[in-house]
Each structure stands twice: as structure tokens, then as C-alpha cells.
Amino acid sequence: MPSILPRFDFRAEYALASDIGATREQYEDAALLAPELGVFAVADGMGGHLAGEVAANLAVEQVKHALSGRSAQRAREAYVASADLDARRRVFAELKRAVERANAFIRDDAERNPEHRGMGTTLDVVWFARDHAFIAHAGDGRVYLARQRAVLQLTQDHTAQAVSRVDGFGRLLGPSQGSGITNALGINEVVTVDMLFVDVSRGDRLLICSDGVYGQIEGEAELSELLRSGAPVQAVGGLIARAALLGRDNATGIVIEIGDRFVKRKDHDRGLNAADLERARQSPLLVDLPLSFALTALSAAVEIEVGEGESLPREIANDLVAYILLDGVVRYPDERRVGAGALLYAESLVGVLGQGDTPSCEQTTRLLRVRADDFAEICTDPRLATELYRRLAMHLARMRANASRRA
């Protein structure tokens, strides 16, 4: 039965299921259903003598505690009231802080209790606000989005083999082969937290799950079939039944279906709908980038609309900016034209004020605008920074070669 989540524009129906696994003596996963906060999470604990169970439960408890606090709720309320980039960043900051708090709490517990030393846990959190899902990810749990005929793996596993299992469109390439986790809560003093958000629409389904679920799925087709079967309670039940039939590990999943929209807004934060995301990922900055990285990069962008004949400035509020075209046509004074997926003023993202003629919009045009300061902020993640700066370098080299040929 669909229900209302406070400060979320859609009704939602959700269900949880789990299984201990054929050969496990302890259940070391943990799940969080907190619809009153718009928060859902799954953790998969690691460590002997029940320590994994302790770590997983501490993770979800601390996330719930942090996101129910005054600071987090104020950030969410501010985003609901006005979904601008600053408000979006506040929500991200609170969500990241909640995961970091959980990491610190787990490590403190391990220091106080010798039998818990070495424990850790993966963690995937989905926090709904307005018409978006904000996601925090650490470890090898996963969040999937099923919409229309596609199933997208939104998160990227923090394992050595992760990149080889996901193609440039975020699709599964085959069953998991397993590998050591390179990042999780409790392992190190600083935990890497992947942050992303997606817009949601009526009919979308989100799956949050531990590796005991997806490890038994043979690819996108099987996952799609199971995830779309019946109501959320039937879907998650089918996924866990499949895991229990073939797997030995704990398996935990939450399925959330987005229902009817009951709040209409004029100041809609368009975010990343499916068509816009596909166009943006054609840009030289994001081409062939794993989906989770692309979503993180685009969380620093704001959508703008520029009228026919208007030019595109290189600076906004004393900060250099770059643009990715979503639709429309931009024309240069030398009659060159570019369309959807084009990246303009790429040099701005490395702090260089470009020279040359300023292009203008041939028609009303929608673009994503990225400030240099915001780009630098998302590049604090060394993995993402490596991918983005490599693409920027290649694009700028091509631009220089093309300019030389035109000269």
C-alpha cells in the first residue's frame, strides 16, 4: 500500500526481505526502514564472533540518529523549499557526515571492545527529498534503479574488479566473480563515501541490497524480471528467494516503488532525468565514465535555459564556468555549430580563462553549468578526479589540434 514520506513529492511503497544463507551461522546484514525520515539503508557486516553484526547494526543506527537530527532535517527542509545548488550541497553534506559519523562510531566501539576489533561493514543509504533520491555508498553493496525498460546500477563496487564488471552505461556485464573489498566503514579512519543523486518518477523502482543478493543474478535481464515482479513485497521476496536458492551468504534487500506524485512544484529541480543524463554522458567530460561517477560529477551542475541570440559568459559571480549542452544549438561567430553533448569552455574547469569569440544560442537552449569551484570540490575524490582530468586533458588536446588546423 503506497504511503506518504514526509518532504517527498511522491507516494511510495516499500518492502524488506532477508535470508541468512545456506552455510552461515550468523546474520551479519542490517537494514533500515525509516519512512518517517525518508531514509532506507542496507549494511553488510564483516568480522568474526558476531562483530560483523555489531558493525552493520551500528552503521544503520548511527545513520538514522544523524539524519533525524536538527541539522539534517533543516538541510532537507531547505532543499524542499528551494532546490538550488547550495541547498543540494547541504543535503549531500549531511548525508556524508552521517556515514562518517557511523564510521567513527564503529571504530570507537572496536577500540573499546577487543572482540570487535577488525570489524567493518558496507553501507548504502537512500534519502528522499522533494523529487530526488540522495544516495551514499561505501563498500560492495549496491543501489539499482529500474525505470521503463532499463535497470541501472547506480553505485560502483569498492572492489578491485569493480570497473571491469560495469560497462560505460552502468549495465551489468555478467555475474559477480567476487574480490576483496577496498573500502568499508570501520576499516580505516577515513572512509570513502560516494555521493550521488537521481530524480525519480512514477513507476521507478529502487533496489538497495547486499552482495548476497546481486551475486546470484545472471545479468540485467534476470535482475529486471525479478525487480519488476508484482508489488515491492513480491519483488524483494523473489530476489531473496533466488539468493537463498543459489547462495551461501546473507542476503538483504529493500525495494522501493515510486507511486503517484501528489505535490506539484513550479521551481522543479530537474536534476538528471533519463534523457538529460544520456545527452550529458555524450560530452567529452563524461563519455564512457561509469554511471556512478557520472552522477557524482553532475551533482555539481545546475540546469539553465538561455534564450535565442543570448551569449554564454565564461564567468559567473567571479567564478569560471563550463557548460554541457542538453538540447538546442550553440553557434560560434565563425559559423561552427554544436549540439547536445557539447562541452563549452572546458579550460574553465582547470582555472584557465579561455580566449576567443563568445558563442551564442541559435535557439532557446538548455545547458548544464558547472562552476570551477564546484568542479574542484567533487574532484577531492582521487578516483573520480583521475577519470575527469584525463578526459579533460584529451579534450583540450583535441581542441588545440583542431584550432591549429583551422588556422
Where are these regions (language model features)?
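PP2C/PPM-type serine/threonine phosphatase catalytic domain
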Residues: M1-G307, L320, V329, L349, ...
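Cyclic nucleotide-binding regulatory domains
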Residues: E310-T364, F375-I378
